């Protein structure tokens, strides 16, 4: 799991650097957009659905892709102030009115009222955040938890079997990472 920690740290640094360049930011988002939209096509959520994305990062590519293509109300959180400031700037540049970016920790943020909660790949410790979701989110809430997927052979496999969450599906993204879809019992 130490390699996963180093990977996450490196990705945060790269995103902060890329976020300083409009060209690199737009490239980063464009490269991921189709993958994100395919991943989220599994959810049949109404137009007024509320989505919480934990760990939005300096370049909130998942948020941008979803907000441009869905009518969901999206809240992105990150505990890193610099990442929050960068993400807010990018959301403003895209002119997205259905997005709020807040500085918050997944272990403390209010989880009520969301139809879908996304746990980003870089969230640590993922199992503790999922345990909290299993206790505090509304029943019927979907959870999409990003995982190392094919890279688990390198980073190690995470134990993400959590009481109170029913596993719906394991999904393999085109970039080699994966996601596990849960529903809160």
What are the roles of these predicted feature ranges?
Residues 87-88:
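Conserved SAM-binding loop
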Residues 140-152:
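Conserved beta-strand signature within the Rossmann-like core of class I S-adenosyl-L-methionine
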Residues 1-46:
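S-adenosyl-L-methionine
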Residues 80-82:
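Conserved SAM/SAH-binding beta-strand->alpha-helix loop
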Residues 58-70:
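Conserved SAM-binding loop of SAM-dependent methyltransferases across substrates and taxa
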Residues 48-58:
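Conserved class I S-adenosyl-L-methionine
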Residues 151-185:
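Active-site capping/gating segments
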Residues 73-78:
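Conserved SAM-binding motif I beta-strand of class I
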